[in-house]
């Protein structure tokens, strides 16, 4: 919480743009889902529940009429913000300040957005979808069987798996999965140490994909063509040295302590067809 005065200064547009770009690069959800620009009041988006169906016809016969089944959802932007204090030395070295902002703020925004989509933290409102309650598939007993079960469930809901998001815990489980000859299933060699693809679909890694529960969730898989996130104006960044900020139980008077604070905020929304997503789970 902070009280920023009218002496706050807007940072250069290119810095805000770079923070947004880095946020998108560090968010697994933003890398996989489709982005749209939102008006401040939000927008209604169509959600296709079933596709039109073509049919063979004889010469001279009437052509069949088939329509897709479509529902609508309201895509609304909610504000996500973070304030970080810095020592005044950073303000005297503007390039160093910009480098620090570009390096630190995107990760904070990306982590919180991913954690919200995955149900690790509470969603900001009713018009924000999460994957918290989607169908779960156990991968601890038999990782390959669990992944195939997720693929099957998604296909049965007219989805096509095109992306995985795994937590570090999930990565460890998959790295230890072997076939009957004890060869690793999901990497070509132990020198790689990463899992770029699972069953032919790209893989992203995010700490937010680990959600404690019964059972614990360690990853997500789905048809990301049916997921969309919206932004209003990109990341807005302001700085102030005349504020009093509260961090937990600690109160910081910036002027008194020769510091300044940077506030970054972005308006984001997320919607998806939850039937074409699965959780990857393990029992504790």
What kind of feature is each model-predicted range?
Residues 2-80, 147, 276:
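Assembly/oligomerization interface modules of large self-assembling protein complexes
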Residues 2-30, 83-94, 110-118, 122-124, ...:
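Short, Lys/Arg-rich flexible segments
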Residues 38-39, 135-260, 264-266, 278:
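Extended oligomerization regions of viral-like shell subunits
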Residues 51-53, 81, 90, 111, ...:
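Short loop/turn segments at secondary-structure transitions that flank enzyme active sites
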Residues 53-57, 94, 173-176, 229, ...:
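Short helix/loop capping segments that flank catalytic or ligand/cofactor-binding pockets
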Residues 71-74, 79-157, 180, 204, ...:
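Alpha-helical scaffold segments that mediate packing/assembly in large oligomeric complexes
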Residues 268-284:
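Structural signal for terminal/edge beta-strands and the immediately following C-terminal loop/tail
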